[in-house]
Amino acid sequence: MKKYFSLIIFFFQILPADASIKIDVINKLKKTENINFNFIQKINEKTEKGNCTIFYPKKIFCEYFDKKGKILVSNGKSLVIKIKNTGAYYFYPLERTPLNLVLDKEFLIRKIEQLDISQENKDIIQFQIIENNQKINIFFDKKTKNLNGWEITDIYQNKNLTTISNILENQILNEKLFLLPKRTD
């Protein structure tokens, strides 16, 4: 019995702290079906705020707190940005945007399993993913292991930093939320 106990103690001494954190982040992601959160998004010098719901895999609905009535919706295949006040309507295949990877929980889990933590401080854990010539920084809260935000370069080559707060997990959702809005002229 002492031999087994010694082996267990030895194993935990050689297990890097990073491995434990990575396992916790991965387990948290695996348990997460959806999240709702407030966000602050900085694109170049412009700051926008709003609320989003992510429903894995690859669905998102965001409503911006602005006077324009801006929304962003992905049904898992396509991404639409619609601005109600101006009638502007932008349609993109999701696979051509960096959000395609951010919204893919299984992709994130696979990458985190392969990566080392790229940065860490008392509050945040960061993983840097490079995929298809895109650099994506994914942030997690060190204490809760919740997704905390991401940094990407958007399809217009703008640096986009999104930080999230007030997270609610695994809520009952109406899937109609993720239907693409119609274009209105």
Describe the function of each predicted region:
Residues N27-T47:
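A short, Trp-centered hydrophobic/proline-enriched beta-strand micro-motif
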Residues K31, T53-K59, S74-S78, N121-K122, ...:
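Short, solvent-exposed coil/turn segments at beta-strand boundaries
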Residues F37-F39, I60-Y64, L79-K82, F127, ...:
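Short hydrophobic/aromatic-rich beta-strand segments that constitute the beta-sheet cores
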Residues Y4-Q13:
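Sec-dependent N-terminal signal peptides
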Residues C52-L101, N160:
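An acidic-aromatic
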Residues N85-I124, I129:
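Flexible, surface-exposed loop/linker segments and immediately adjacent secondary-structure boundaries
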Residues R110-D185:
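Gly/Pro-enriched, hydrophobic low-complexity segments
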Residues P16-A19:
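Boundary at the C-terminal end of the N-terminal hydrophobic targeting segment
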